[in-house]
């Protein structure tokens, strides 16, 4: 089964997730599409401003410094020196396994749909993707599109599930790999994995644990789909909760639950 990966251009945790996936499936993966970190119609600068307002100066500047370091390491070690011993970007991971990289602004465009058809793509894996996948794209992908979401669906649909899981003082988190349909985080679930949340876990702790589980869940999902007729869990909309970008009161609630960003 010919596969294609849609993944966010995030240098922190996603290179490790993609590396684990391609270690198993690089021979049957036709390409990796790297999507902007900006959500929906927001620009990168607007997204950065949203995160600054959410995180505050201290955590935001710490993330920015780490981001710059990761980008410099990727440029020097991976791009200029050509080393793939330590991959600091998702593009470097794809290069390590000899998988083509694309950076289409819109994966629903006729041009990109034709590219997928030319590659014979039958199945798409979305890892922290930032675009909605429209009907034409879904219909031409014979085995479907799956998305990995960092929460125990049907709860915590939408943005920043790790933050909301902590803000609501949950004792358990998880990841769900589900088929994509016309609604956000709505399709039937193929694989769901859980992890324990400890009393003083930080947002960084939970995001790291979530991404480690995500790699396992994605690999398990792909194997089930390739085997044919995977067992599915319901993802009922009437039991769902939806969340968007947190506001100041949500951050105060997050802190009242004795959690920190790092």
What are these regions (language model features)?
Residues 1-262:
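One-carbon transfer enzymes
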